[in-house]
Amino acid sequence: NNSYDRYWEGRKAWGQIVISLRNLARTMQVSIPVHNEQEWQQKKRAFQLLIAFPIAVKLHLRQNPDNQELADFLTPAECATLDQVPNRPIYITLWLQDYLQKQMDCQRVDSNRAWELDDSVNQLIQGLATCERIVHTPLPMAYVIYLKQLILVYCIALPLGLKPELGWSMVFIVGMVAFILMGVEELAREIENPFGLDVNDLPLDDLCTTIRRNVTMISQFQPPLFPSTDDR
C-alpha cells in the first residue's frame, strides 16, 4: 500500500505539472500581446522554457546530468548554465518568472492575469517538490526487511495450517501462495520510486511529449477575426 501510494502521489504531482504548464501557456498566449519581432522572440523563448521544464524535472528525478534533451529547446548558453546548477527545474522557473515579471512591469498583463501566471508557476514548484520528496524519502529499510521476513515466516508456517489429507497437493498450494506474496513484494519494491526507467514506472517520456505538443499547439493559436458590427 505504501509503495502504491507513492506511485499514485507521483502521478498526481505530474498531473499538477501538466495542468499548470497548460494554464501558463494558455494565459501567456491570450493575455500577453506582441507588437514586434523582439517581443515575439521573447515570448517564443518563454514557451520553450515551458517545454523544457518537464524534461528538466524528469532528468532531475532520474539524477541524469546530461542536458542533451534540453538542447532542442534551450540555447547553448542556457544549457551551459544549467550544467552548473544543482536544480535545473528551479532555475528554469527563474528564467520564466523573470520574463513574466518584465511583462508585468511593462503593464502588458493586468493584475488578475498576473496573479494567475504567478500561481501557475507556484504550482510547478509544488509539483516538483512532491516528486523530490518521493525520491529522497525511500521506504525505511527496517520496513522492507520486516516485510520479507514476515512473508518467509508465513510461507514456512502455512503447511502447518493445511489439512494433512491434501498430501502432495500441499506443495503446490504453498508454492502458489509464496509466488503470489513474493510477487506482490517485488512489485512494491519496483514502484517505490515511480520516476525511473523500469517498465512499471510512470511514462515520463510520454508525459513530456504530450506537454510539448500541447504547448506548441497553444503557442500557434490565432484568435478568430469576427466581422465588425458595421459590416453586418
Residues of each region from the PLM?
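Structured inter-helical modules in multipass membrane proteins
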Residues: T27-M141
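Juxtamembrane membrane-water interface segments immediately C-terminal to a transmembrane helix
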Residues: Y7-V18
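Short alpha-helical basic/polar micro-motif
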Residues: N2, G15, A129, R189
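Solvent-exposed, non-transmembrane helices and loops of integral membrane proteins
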Residues: L21-I51, F195-R232
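Alpha-helical transmembrane anchor segments
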Residues: R133-L225
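A residue-level signal for conserved active-site and pocket-lining positions in enzyme catalytic cores
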Residues: I17, V57, I191
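Transmembrane alpha-helices and immediately adjacent membrane-cytoplasm interface residues
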Residues: N1-Y7
